[in-house]
């Protein structure tokens, strides 16, 4: 660097009266050659009025300056002393940079990035430091004068100076210290930390569609944050305990159980100072008798009355202090006056398990300090950039040719491109068939040869239906040239569905084996783009590598070139104008004014009884079964199903899944237009049917939007978390970045912290699987932008999320360190590592469920389990008050090397079933423990306390004894009796006596345990049969000390079990052994006609019937819950039960061999 030198200097204050330099002086009037083409002729010699005013105000400020002998202002620089100009490049242009306290002319190359330009400037002006102004470049941002005469902030420091719009008689940039700018930078840094990837790099890789998507996400974030609760118990983060339904009365069976066990409510209270300091050791206990009519307010009134009777009060409490109830051991509250206490899930579970519900009485004013009103959202820089771009495009359109619109041409997206001035038509204005031609193929995985030919297949499909197919003539790989002619599909453009997908498959063949095709790659793309316009012209597509056809539902090309570098360029015939897809108004117009109607007799569907009595109804049922079995219906059969569309719309809305897979619907615009119009008044389908419509079987955006809207109406804030995993999978089948599924997930996450917390980790585990191809992978970028929007709307909790992310990173590192070590060495290594970093993992929300708070880590209990992946078992103290009544310790298993998504899905289905049964007043005592995937093959599993596997129970010293226990029908019953306090009669105590046993108390505990086992066995028997859970053995069946039975490890579901020599190992429909039946009979010999066994059978049938009634999705019944009517369903499962009851010998044999193998 060099700069012009001057003579002696004086550093002093001066104002405008001391000969300050004019900003419009001749010295600064040079215009960079590179920018000359950008300057407006009208602004060449006239300074902008707003800029002139700003400069006049700036010149009247008090500021420092240097004066030389000739009186000219100068700069005091770090490297060269005094100079009149900062020279960063000898051959650059001159630009004026206005600092907050002085002005400097700078000669620089316009190829330099703004970040580097700013850094070099501040390296030079260190001696010019003045007053409170910082000289750190990161504290400043640039501003410039834009095309509209506005001073705007430049947020992207990675762009070059040549990209800026510098106007006026000379180019100028302004530096300022923004208040919100640093906040945005810090927030972006925090979000990058949470994502595990830089937002700056992500911004560089997103295209126009993703920029629009990002702006739409921000709009939805702002709208949701404005509408969500932010005060008191309505705060979006306030943890209200899940409840079943409003106005529900206490079930009779539950009331009888509570009275028999003499259960009551236990409330704990402490002084204000102790509560404020979170000191819970000394608490007063008040017991209140159970009343099935109690709600939170009535229980609270009883508590206050008891408090007054005991003369307990705190003088520090104000007279108007309000109280709320917190469940013992959980950050979960019960506050709703319209909800009875027995309707709350946590309270109901305690009562069903013969435990007294415990509450901590909290002061509302202290509790709500943790749920303050969030600070206003800070509008991110990309929103202002996007709005500016839209405004510029509007200006471009306004000075162009007026846009010609055809009738009813409402736009799906507001289009502000300059090309919007081109004439626009709709798809229905075209009078031709779809035409495509191949252009070239690159990136072949082999050397070109005269003996190898290349072929290409084009297919247009919707959902599971192929509408048209063309195979292109093969050409030698040495000359990959096709004739310049288009191939015409048998698909009339007017009848092409708006969500039609083009599939391209490339294959090779050898001249010696011309009948054998070797697939090289494939790709699917929507024939309409994100603006809802028909794709036209040449398109280059990166192909995906060969996969089974069942996995080819992915829409979008392989931007990251995962697995293959093969790409193909195709050309879709152009029509000289922009072609929009039809819109809602056009569909309605066509349906109202169509000329011809189908000759098929239509069923109105209003009278249900008349419809099911129609002979055609039986045929409809048969055709639905035929369709679901995989048989393709012929045209006459499809027309029969279609003729029942009005009945289906009003009476059996789930059959929309079948209608959406009829070919006659998607090959005639009259039919799919009518279906679209009918959706406006379509009865809501079941949750199961809506989720099916969001899977890969349906690609139509109108139907998918309908499914999301109906699903959103049916899911409450308390059960939506059960469906997050399938909804995230549904994102992968969306043809465009913007989707109703994504917007629904974002809205729900921002409206409930608990839902958002789980969604964050599920989304993060998805992007971790794609991190190796991050910037070029469309799925990665979509999910990352969705996560960014959530984190921007959840800024209050982002620091807590960062702590959890850091915890996962540390545990991943430690799990890698202990792999391969012996059991003892691995345990010591784990504990040594935890001693140095455990403080980082304490006083933090549990990633599994934020209602639990990790307190102090119990390092002495940390172990490395002996399985192949060597998972870590970690223990924390539960930091919530009175955790000893519920869960004293939070125990988790951290796994590195297993995909936990299938386990999580099965456990969520179990949780859904549990909710359905409880709503029907059947508590099956299920134990759907928590599982959370947190990265690529990384996740955590909740440990159910005080339990053992059946193998651990039967395991005894010596192989013979262990094998003997496997066939002993009483060994599990003996173990339960021991946990209840009974002493094994065969073990005699030595003289002096043994422990005294309270026989009555032990008997009471034993019968309670038997009751828990009975109901949990009912639940898991029915649930595992419905889901087809296989590979059941004594190492994945668990038993708790209080009698609950449950399953773990769900690697084989939907009937896909292990086989040996072609023979299915699991030959029973569900596990029902003699050991189980012995417990059910309280230790007595098994008798199928006994009262206990008959009760068990009746409960199984009732549980199955409840599930049959709730699985309204008919075709799912053919897979899981068989039986056309309730009577037939009950009869069917009675046969299943008898098969399991009579086949217990096979399970006993499996357990024997499993014990001998793993002893």
Curated annotation (Swiss-Prot):
Signal peptide annotation: none
Domain PI3K-RBD: 272-363
Region (Catalytic loop), start-end ranges: 1028-1036
Ranges for domain PI3K-ABD: 79-179
Catalysed conversion reaction: a 1,2-diacyl-sn-glycero-3-phospho-(1D-myo-inositol) + ATP = a 1,2-diacyl-sn-glycero-3-phospho-(1D-myo-inositol-3-phosphate) + ADP + H(+)
GO-annotated cellular components: cytoplasm; phosphatidylinositol 3-kinase complex; plasma membrane
Originating species: Caenorhabditis briggsae
Domain PIK helical: 607-793
Cited PANTHER family: PHOSPHATIDYLINOSITOL 3-KINASE AGE-1, PHOSPHATIDYLINOSITOL KINASE
Keyword Heme: no
Cited Gene3D superfamilies: 3.10.20.770, C2 domain, Phosphatidylinositol 3-/4-kinase, catalytic domain, Phosphatidylinositol 3-kinase Catalytic Subunit, Chain A, domain 4, Phosphatidylinositol 3-kinase, accessory domain (PIK)
Full protein name: Phosphatidylinositol 3-kinase age-1
Region (G-loop): 864-870
Annotated GO MF terms: 1-phosphatidylinositol-3-kinase activity; 1-phosphatidylinositol-4-phosphate 3-kinase activity; ATP binding
């Amino acid at each position: 660097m060099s700069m012009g030198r001057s003579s002696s200097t004086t550093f002093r204050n001066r104002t405008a009266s001391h000969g300050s330099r004019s900003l419009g002086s001749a010295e600064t009037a040079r215009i960079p050659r590179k920018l000359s083409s950008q300057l407006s002729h009208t602004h060449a010699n006239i300074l902008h009025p707003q800029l002139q005013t700003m400069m006049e105000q700036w010149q009247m400020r008090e500021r420092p300056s240097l004066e030389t002998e000739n009186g000219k202002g100068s700069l005091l620089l770090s490297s060269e002393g005094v100079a009149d100009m900062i020279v960063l490049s000898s051959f650059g242009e001159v630009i004026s940079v206005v600092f907050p306290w002085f002005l400097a002319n700078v000669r620089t190359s316009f190829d330099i990035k703004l970040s580097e330009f700013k850094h070099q400037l501040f390296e030079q002006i260190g001696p010019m430091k003045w007053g409170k102004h910082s000289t750190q470049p990161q504290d400043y941002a640039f501003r410039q004068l834009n095309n509209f005469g506005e001073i705007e902030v430049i947020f992207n420091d990675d762009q070059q100076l040549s990209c800026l719009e510098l106007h006026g008689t000379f180019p100028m940039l302004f530096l300022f210290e923004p208040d919100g700018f640093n906040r945005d930078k810090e927030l972006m840094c925090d979000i990058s930390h949470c994502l595990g990837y830089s937002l700056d790099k992500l911004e560089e890789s997103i295209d126009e569609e993703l920029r629009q998507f990002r702006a739409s996400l921000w709009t939805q974030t702002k709208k949701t944050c404005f509408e969500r609760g932010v005060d008191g118990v309505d705060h979006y983060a306030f943890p209200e305990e899940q409840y079943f339904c409003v106005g529900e009365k206490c079930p009779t069976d539950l009331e009888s159980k509570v009275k028999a066990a003499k259960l009551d409510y236990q409330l704990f209270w402490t002084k204000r100072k102790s509560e404020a300091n979170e000191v819970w050791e000394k608490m007063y206990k008040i017991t209140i008798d159970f009343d099935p009519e109690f709600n939170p307010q009535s229980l609270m009134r009883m508590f206050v009355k008891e408090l007054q009777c005991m003369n307990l009060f705190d003088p520090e409490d104000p007279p108007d202090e309000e109280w709320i109830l917190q469940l013992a051991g959980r950050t979960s509250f019960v506050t709703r006056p319209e909800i009875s206490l027995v309707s709350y899930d946590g309270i109901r579970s305690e009562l069903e398990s013969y435990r007294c519900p415990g509450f901590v009485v909290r002061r509302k004013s202290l509790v709500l300090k943790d749920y303050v009103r969030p600070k206003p959202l800070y509008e991110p820089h990309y929103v202002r950039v996007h709005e500016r771009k839209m405004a510029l495009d509007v200006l471009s359109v306004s000075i162009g040719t007026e846009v010609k619109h055809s009738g009813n041409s409402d736009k799906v997206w507001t289009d502000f491109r300059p090309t919007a001035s081109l004439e626009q038509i709709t798809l229905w204005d075209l009078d031709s068939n779809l035409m495509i031609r191949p252009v070239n193929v690159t990136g072949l995985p082999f050397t070109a040869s005269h003996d190898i030919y290349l072929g290409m297949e084009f297919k247009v499909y919707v959902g599971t239906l192929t509408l048209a197919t063309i195979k292109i003539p093969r050409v030698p790989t040495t000359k990959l040239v096709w004739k310049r002619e288009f191939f015409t599909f048998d698909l009339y453009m007017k009848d092409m569905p708006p969500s039609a997908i083009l599939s391209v498959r490339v294959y090779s063949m050898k001249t010696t084996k011309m009948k054998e095709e070797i697939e090289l790659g494939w790709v699917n793309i929507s024939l309409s783009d994100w603006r809802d316009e028909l794709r036209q012209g040449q398109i280059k597509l990166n192909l995906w590598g060969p996969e089974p056809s069942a996995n080819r539902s992915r829409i979008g090309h392989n931007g990251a070139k995962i697995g293959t570098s093969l790409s193909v360029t195709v050309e879709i015939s152009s029509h000289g104008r922009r072609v929009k897809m039809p819109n809602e108004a056009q569909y309605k117009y066509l349906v109202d004014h169509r000329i011809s109607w189908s000759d098929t007799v239509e069923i109105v569907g209003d009278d249900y009884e008349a419809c099911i009595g129609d002979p055609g109804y039986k045929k409809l049922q048969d055709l639905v079964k035929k369709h679901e079995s995989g048989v393709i219906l012929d045209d006459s059969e499809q027309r029969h199903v279609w003729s029942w569309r009005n009945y289906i719309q009003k009476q059996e809305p789930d059959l929309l899944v079948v209608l959406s897979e009829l070919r006659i619907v998607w090959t005639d615009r009259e039919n799919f237009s009518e279906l679209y119009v009918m959706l406006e008044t379509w009865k809501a389908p079941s949750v199961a049917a809506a989720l099916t419509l969001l899977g890969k079987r349906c690609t139509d955006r109108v139907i998918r939007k309908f499914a999301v809207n109906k699903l959103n109406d049916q899911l409450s804030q308390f059960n939506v978390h059960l469906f997050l995993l399938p909804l995230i999978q549904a994102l992968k089948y969306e043809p465009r970045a913007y989707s109703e599924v994504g917007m629904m997930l974002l809205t729900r996450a921002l409206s409930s912290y608990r839902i958002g917390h789980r969604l964050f980790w599920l989304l993060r585990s998805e992007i971790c699987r794609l991190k190796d191809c991050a910037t070029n992978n469309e799925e990665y970028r979509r999910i990352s932008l969705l996560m960014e929007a959530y984190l921007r709307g959840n800024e209050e909790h982002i620091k807590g999320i960062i702590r959890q992310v850091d915890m996962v990173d540390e545990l991943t590192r430690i799990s890698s360190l202990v792999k391969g070590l012996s059991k003892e060495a691995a345990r010591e290594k784990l504990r040594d590592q935890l001693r140095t970093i455990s403080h980082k993992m304490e006083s933090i929300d549990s990633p599994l469920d934020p209602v639990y708070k990790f307190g102090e880590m119990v390092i002495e209990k940390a172990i490395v389990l002996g399985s192949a992946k060597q998972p870590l078992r970690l223990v924390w103290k539960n930091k919530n008050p009175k955790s000893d009544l519920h869960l004293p310790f939070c125990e988790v298993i951290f796994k590195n090397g297993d995909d936990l998504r299938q386990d999580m899905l099965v456990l969520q289905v179990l949780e859904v079933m549990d909710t359905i049964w409880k709503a029907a007043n059947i508590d099956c005592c299920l134990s759907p423990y928590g599982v959370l995937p947190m990265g690529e093959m990384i996740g955590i599993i909740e440990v159910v306390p005080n339990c053992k596997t059946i193998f651990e129970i039967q395991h005894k010293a010596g192989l013979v004894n262990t094998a003997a226990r496997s066939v002993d029908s009483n060994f599990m019953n003996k173990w339960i009796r021991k946990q209840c306090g009974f002493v094994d009669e065969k073990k005699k105590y030595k003289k002096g006596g043994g422990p005294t046993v309270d026989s009555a108390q032990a008997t009471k505990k034993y019968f309670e345990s038997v009751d828990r086992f009975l109901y949990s066995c009912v639940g898991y028997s029915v649930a595992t049969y419905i889901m087809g859970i296989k590979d059941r053995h004594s190492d994945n069946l668990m038993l708790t000390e209080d009698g609950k039975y449950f399953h773990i490890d769900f690697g084989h579901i939907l009937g896909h079990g292990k086989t040996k020599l072609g023979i299915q190992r699991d030959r029973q429909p569900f596990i029902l052994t003699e050991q189980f039946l012995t417990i059910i009979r309280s230790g007595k010999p098994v008798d199928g006609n006994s009262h206990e066994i008959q009760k068990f059978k009746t409960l199984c049938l009732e549980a199955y019937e409840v599930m049959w009634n709730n699985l309204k999705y008919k075709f799912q019944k053919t897979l899981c819950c068989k039986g056309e009517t309730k009577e037939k369903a009950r009869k069917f499962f009675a046969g299943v039960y008898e098969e399991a009851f009579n086949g217990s010998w096979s399970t006993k044999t499996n357990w024997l061999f499993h014990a001998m193998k793993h002893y």
